[in-house]
Amino acid sequence: MQTAARRSFDYDMPLIQTPTSACQIRQAWAKVADTPDHETAGRLKDEIKVLLKRKNAVLVAHYYVDPLIQDLALETGGCVGDSLEMARFGAEHEAGTLVVAGVRFMGESAKILCPEKTVLMPDLEAECSLDLGCPEEAFSAFCDQHPDRTVAVYANTSAAVKARADWVVTSSVALEIVSYLKSRGEKLIWGPDRHLGDYIRRETGADMLLWQGSCIVHNEFKGQELAALKAEHPDAVVLVHPESPQSVIELGDVVGSTSKLLKAAVSRPEKKFIVATDLGILHEMQKQAPDKEFIAAPTAGNGGSCKSCAFCPWMAMNSLGGIKHALTGGRNEILLDRKLGEAAKLPLQRMLDFAAGLKRGDVFNGMGPA
């Protein structure tokens, strides 16, 4: 067994995952609708507002979706947040129908936590490269090879993979949960994001076996180009999501979830920020800190057709038209087998309970509830 100090590109598992193919990515981009003109967008938003009230529905959106959808969610009493905030909001809201604007695992998580609610999505084909790269059968076989290890999986996974896990985590609470498990002497299997897993392993010193998944957006950030950009803007604060490669994370002044990066952008006194995450977050950053400058971190070097192409094609598949379509006749509903949902809820609820304890400021054994 190699130690936590080993080089970040040495991982513990053979390449047995199903990688996200260029064909899948092209297919996703092909389904992205054109941005509607101002008049059409206004009409669609008005129609959706009526439908949300009529259906006793609430719109729950991720920071990475179209700004039009983010604004609509807030205008109608919904939520814009990271995956942890979305899950918590959906579980606590009284609406009988949740419209989840994000990627499929987010809709599944909402259904797992609220099986009695109707969960709709603008497009059921809005996937996630981490989910696609971690098929349940292969991941379960990997876990079976290490029965003495606690299985912790990122929220960016299918309901079937969650059901195989002991813990589900998001980037908002991953360090705290792994620190807690380490304090209990537990050894871990981590999946699917190898960069986030390696970052957590280096930060906590936990004994972790890593699955080799990655996010197609964050995996493209380039450390060398980011260093050059940072040299051009020495007064800028570098904000990095931990799904990025180690060479990028090491340049970060703040490393964390989308919510943590947003909070840093708003609360820190500096006026310039380089942002290494999906560019969808820039909308909320600019809204909350209009006096500050935000620079997209580079995803390509010299000769690249796009210096920063940090957009998730599946997030981009969410559209106002898709939301209207979902609400008209209840289309695009997330359906889960009852037993599968119950099994997946245990590790997911464990994370939410843990996060609630952190928020309350409970006394912890190590970093988690005793």
Swiss-Prot record:
Positions contributing to [4Fe-4S] cluster binding: 128, 215, 312
Pathway recorded for this protein: Cofactor biosynthesis; NAD(+) biosynthesis; quinolinate from iminoaspartate: step 1/1
Compartment(s) of residence: Cytoplasm
Reactions mediated catalytically: iminosuccinate + dihydroxyacetone phosphate = quinolinate + phosphate + 2 H2O + H(+)
GO molecular function, one term: metal ion binding
Residue sites binding iminosuccinate per the record: 62, 83, 154-156, 171, 241-243, 258
GO cellular component labels: cytosol
GO-annotated biological processes: 'de novo' NAD biosynthetic process from L-aspartate
InterPro entries the UniProt entry points to: NadA (IPR003473), NadA_sf (IPR036094), Quinolinate_synth_A_type1 (IPR023513)
Cofactor stoichiometry and binding remark: Binds 1 [4Fe-4S] cluster per subunit.
Signal peptide feature range: none
E.C. no: 2.5.1.72
Cofactor: [4Fe-4S] cluster
Keyword Cytoplasm attached: yes
Keyword annotations from UniProtKB, A to Z: 4Fe-4S, Cytoplasm, Iron, Iron-sulfur, Metal-binding, Pyridine nucleotide biosynthesis, Transferase
Function per UniProt: Catalyzes the condensation of iminoaspartate with dihydroxyacetone phosphate to form quinolinate.
UniProt xrefs under NCBIfam families: nadA, PRK09375.1-1, PRK09375.1-2
Family to which this protein belongs: Belongs to the quinolinate synthase family. Type 1 subfamily.
The name this protein goes by in its record: Quinolinate synthase
